[in-house]
Amino acid sequence: MGQFISFMQEIPIFLQEALNIALVAVSLICIVKGLVNLYRCGLFQLMVFLVLAGRSCSEETFKIGMHTQFQEVSLSLSALLTNQSHELPMLCLANKTHLYLKSGRSSFKINIDSVTVLTRSADVFVHSPKLGSCFESDEEWVVAWWIEAIGHRWDQDPGLLCRNKTKTEGKLIQINISRADGNVHYGWRLKNGLDHIYRGREEPCFEGEQCLIKIQPEDWPTDCKADHTNTFRFLSRSQKSIAVGRTLKAFFSWSLTDPLGNEAPGGYCLEKWMLVASELKCFGNTAIAKCNQNHDSEFCDMLRLFDYNKNAIKTLNEETKTRVNVLSHTINALISDNLLMKNKIRELMSVPYCNYTRFWYVNHTLSGQHSLPRCWMIRNNSYLNSSEFRNEWILESDFLISEMLSKEYSERQGRTPITLVDICFWSTVFFTSTLFLHLIGFPTHEHIRGEGCPLPHRLNSMGGCRCGKYLPLKKPTIWHRRH
């Protein structure tokens, strides 16, 4: 699995090679052609016929020639119930007795019992949807909306009691829905409203007893999930109030932001910096690496000489000129004694020698690669003509080209993954195998000789349907390859 993941990650890289592109093309052609051969040989059709034919005699099992499909779609409106300040309310019924309401960042718990908490003498009496003295502004509208949804009419029904929001006991509103005396019709109407928006709730109050609804802020329980069907029931109960006092906001709005959440209407800008290289010819790490491997070269001695002198001058910049000269002479003595002696003997014998001044190398103009510089020999105080050491620089050029080809071959081998070669090999084997299957061919179904295909039914030896839908015709059957 790891090899496959690595192979997929390297696709943009190895497609830069022509050989890799050819391998990919051959693999794709073999795979596609192999699948076509498998389809044309009839093997798939025969397997489908043997597995499915005769399972059912219904006319609806297979529809030959029909291009319609039975499909379904499921809608989830939970995305609309987002955590915005003006969202559609969510309702929840937990354990059939605990009622909850949530809208925006405010959530409430609705309790129904017979315990009186608020009194008219000590608390606020309200008879309008303006609940500013009881709740905050972002809570006031949703509580008033919920009260109207269960059937309360502000201009006709009794007033409500609520605790002043400045008190430390907490926010609370109390509604009397007792079905007794003159309150019976009002109580039944609000009970029916609760039953409509909270389907399946259990009624804790009995006929003739005191029954109070208490609404107070509380955290939304974790076991309550967003259910848009309850929201639809809530909206259907308060259709008139929605049209007048509510506007749905920001359901399908979007904006571009950066990773920190700041608005970025213009999107992102991509800046690309480029480095400009000079035309200076440099002998880079390749030449240094060769010098580290092979020390018997005048050019490498000069590199070491320059390096030592540079470091000495940098370190002893404030030293006297005499100390610098002494140190320079000492460092220059590090040049290979063997080469110095050899060049001196050559000079005495009038044999070409090196004076560490002029060097030659073979440069490849297309790739910019070059050989390791070699000393240009001197004889009789004059440099040799290039034709005098023609064999040397021709041989050096051969070495350079061989080195370049070897390096290029190694790089190409490295850029051709083994997985790609395996895919190409096995796809070719797959194509060859399916080619033989296509030449052989398989029968795809059975039907009565000389008559049409009775798909999807499977026939017996008497020419009848095995499931009993059609009577035996006592006609011979034959296997056919195509319809």
Curated annotation (Swiss-Prot):
Site keyed Cleavage: positions: 58-59, 249-250
Alphabetical UniProt keywords: Disulfide bond, Fusion of virus membrane with host endosomal membrane, Fusion of virus membrane with host membrane, Glycoprotein, Host cell membrane, Host endoplasmic reticulum, Host Golgi apparatus, Host membrane, Host-virus interaction, Lipoprotein, Membrane, Metal-binding, Myristate, Transmembrane, Transmembrane helix, Viral attachment to host cell, Viral envelope protein, Viral penetration into host cytoplasm, Virion, Virus endocytosis by host, Virus entry into host cell, Zinc
InterPro entries in the cross-refs: Arena_glycoprot, Arena_glycoprot_zinc-bd
Residues that span the membrane, as ranges: 18-32, 34-53, 423-443
Protein task: Stable signal peptide (SSP): cleaved and functions as a signal peptide. In addition, it is also retained as the third component of the GP complex. The SSP is required for efficient glycoprotein expression, post-translational maturation cleavage of GP1 and GP2, glycoprotein transport to the cell surface plasma membrane, formation of infectious virus particles, and acid pH-dependent glycoprotein-mediated cell fusion.
Annotated family: Belongs to the arenaviridae GPC protein family.
UniProt-recorded name of the protein: Pre-glycoprotein polyprotein GP complex
